[in-house]
């Protein structure tokens, strides 16, 4: 494999963002399983979002999907960063794009349907979007 | 590969080495971007994403009013009816009273009712330490442009259920079947289904609801709550100490135990 120039910086940042997303998803899942609202601090909205019907999909907490997704994404990012595996980069790119679509939909639900913003969910969405943007740049540079 | 020992250290040198190691003929004849799988991945993932999103919008968008008369969800932790006393539950001489101003349409009230209160029932109500009293604060329905106020109607149904000694089963079933706000979750047909599931004499219950006096009572108690400073749901009060919003079982438990231990509370 060719060790393309931006791999180090981009790999680190992508992995860090994927792990940040994983941490948030694990926290939200733990709060859900414990039956307690996520701690929002002075910002309100987490309780409303967590209690809404959209917090589960087919009876499964949405946070569980987030945990699974972030684990796979983090593995792909690490594989590219540490092993220069180009397939892993493309996997991260595809997963990231799916993640961006998913968080865009969930953010739409928060703003326009539930009428409340959960800062944890917003943080997760930000990590996914920025992570995917980095992945897209890295993939473009790698393939160019 | 033995090339590894000669990997150029700077970015420019690596790029130069890559150019050198590449195949100039291929680079000239075909744009390298065209060989990239990015476009293919974007197309496939984007296409699948759009299809899945459309499915979700149809599935979740249809889970409100259109599902109103479909099968109801059973309460996960039904309130022990033996401890019920109208819209209160627990011994009348319990040292601590938790008053709750609630709205059947409020999602956080739903979380309080389905996750926190059942734990409090087990830990404090059953042993006789706590009495929980529910009050109406029917705010959410006012956000609807419809003349049918789902918060008020659900609350009225609860009062008529209380007339039959079954407020708590009704509230358990109602909160277990929240489905959006002002979207038909508490349409008359669905409330009737809930009343049936809660074990009420439905004809008597319907006659009670039809008089409109229960709705007036809900609105009156809501006005009293507003006058007393309640402007959000759920609002709670433990022996006079006001708590706005949801709290964990542990947090409420600490307040309950403190109130029970205090001379005025005990």
What are these regions (language model features)?
Chain B
Residues 79-96:
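A short beta-strand-turn-helix
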Residues 94, 102-104, 110-194:
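Structural alpha/beta surface segment adjacent to cysteine/selenocysteine redox centers
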Residues 82-87, 117-119, 222-224:
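A generic local structural motif
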Residues 67-77:
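Juxtamembrane extracytosolic/periplasmic "stalk" immediately C-terminal to the first targeting helix
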Residues 41, 75-80:
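Basic/polar, acidic-poor N-terminal "presequence/leader" segments
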Residues 100-103, 230:
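Processing junctions and N-termini across compartments
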Residues 2-67, 96, 192-266:
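C-terminal cap of thioredoxin/glutaredoxin-like
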Residues 101, 134-135, 206, 234:
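Short beta-strands and strand-loop turn motifs
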């Amino acid at each position: 494999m060719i060790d393309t120039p931006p791999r180090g910086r981009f790999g680190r940042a992508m992995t860090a963002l994927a792990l940040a997303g994983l941490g948030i998803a694990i926290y939200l899942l733990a709060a859900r399983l414990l039956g307690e609202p996520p701690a929002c601090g002075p910002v309100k909205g987490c309780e409303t979002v967590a209690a809404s019907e959209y917090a589960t999909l087919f009876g499964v907490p949405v946070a569980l999907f987030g945990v699974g997704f972030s684990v796979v994404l983090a593995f792909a990012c690490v594989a590219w960063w540490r092993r220069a595996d180009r397939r892993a980069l493309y996997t991260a790119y595809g997963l990231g794009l799916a993640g961006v679509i998913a968080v865009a939909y969930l953010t739409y639900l928060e703003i326009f349907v539930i009428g409340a913003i959960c800062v944890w969910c917003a943080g997760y969405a930000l990590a996914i979007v920025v992570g995917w943007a980095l992945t897209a740049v890295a993939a473009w540079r790698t393939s160019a | 590969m033995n090339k590894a020992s000669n990997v150029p250290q700077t970015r420019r040198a690596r790029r130069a080495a890559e150019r050198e190691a590449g195949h100039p003929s291929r680079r000239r004849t075909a744009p390298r971007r065209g060989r990239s799988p990015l476009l293919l991945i974007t197309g496939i993932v984007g296409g699948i994403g759009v299809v899945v999103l459309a499915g979700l919008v149809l599935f979740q968008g249809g889970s409100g009013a259109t599902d109103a008369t479909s099968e109801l969800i059973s309460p996960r932790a039904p309130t022990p009816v033996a401890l019920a006393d109208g819209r209160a539950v627990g011994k009348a001489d319990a040292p601590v009273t938790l008053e709750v101003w609630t709205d059947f349409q409020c999602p956080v009230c739903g979380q309080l009712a389905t996750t926190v209160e059942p734990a409090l029932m087990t830990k404090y109500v059953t042993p006789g330490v706590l009495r929980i009293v529910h009050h109406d604060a029917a705010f959410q329905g006012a956000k609807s442009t419809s003349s049918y106020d789902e918060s008020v109607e659900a609350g009225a149904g609860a009062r008529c259920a209380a007339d039959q000694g079954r407020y708590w089963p009704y509230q358990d079933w109602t909160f277990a079947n929240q489905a959006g706000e002002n979207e038909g979750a508490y349409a008359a047909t669905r409330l009737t289904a809930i009343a049936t599931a809660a074990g009420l004499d439905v004809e008597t219950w319907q006659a009670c609801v039809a008089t409109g006096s229960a709705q007036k009572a809900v609105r009156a108690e809501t006005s009293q709550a507003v006058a007393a400073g309640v402007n959000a749901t759920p609002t709670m009060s433990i022996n006079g100490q006001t708590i706005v919003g949801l709290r964990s079982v542990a947090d409420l438990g600490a307040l309950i135990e403190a109130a029970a231990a205090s001379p005025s509370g005990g």
